[in-house]
């Protein structure tokens, strides 16, 4: 920075550095800002008004996932019996543990739903 000038008072002399030129901002159209704001609010509205899955859909989807884990375990086990070199034992063990855990969780959910239903129907 090169000094532009000096400021002097009775005790000191100050050198004033040059200021960097501030970039000019072109004209801003209010309409372009509004369009960007509308675009943002549209995205928010879509996220907020997104249809939620019903309890039935959520439950069926979870049971489908449990079924997929069971099928994957069966396939890996069968593949291990037919061609042991093509499958890692660790993968089979992990798949079995995931399938077992998901089945236990599904059973717990079913038990809780039935208990809640029985409580509601008998609470006349």
From Swiss-Prot:
GO terms for biological process: bacterial-type flagellum-dependent cell motility. It is found in: Bacterial flagellum basal body. Keywords: Bacterial flagellum. It holds the Pfam family FliE. InterPro entries: FliE (IPR001624). One of its GO terms (cellular component) is bacterial-type flagellum basal body. One of its GO terms (molecular function) is structural molecule activity. PANTHER family: FLAGELLAR HOOK-BASAL BODY COMPLEX PROTEIN FLIE, PTHR34653. NCBIfam families: fliE. Belongs to the FliE family. This is Flagellar hook-basal body complex protein FliE.
């Amino acid at each position: 920075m090169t000094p532009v000038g000096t400021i002097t008072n009775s005790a000191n002399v100050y050198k004033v550095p040059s200021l960097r030129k501030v970039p000019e901002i072109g004209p801003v159209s209010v309409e372009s800002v509004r369009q960007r704001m509308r675009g943002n609010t549209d995205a928010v509205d879509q996220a907020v008004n997104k249809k939620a899955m019903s309890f039935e859909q959520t439950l069926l989807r979870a049971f489908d996932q449990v079924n997929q884990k069971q099928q994957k375990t069966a396939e890996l086990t069968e593949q291990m019996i037919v061609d042991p070199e093509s499958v890692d034992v660790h993968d089979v063990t992990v798949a079995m543990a995931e399938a077992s855990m998901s089945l236990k969780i599904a059973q717990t959910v079913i038990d809780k739903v039935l208990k809640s239903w029985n409580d509601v129907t008998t609470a006349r």
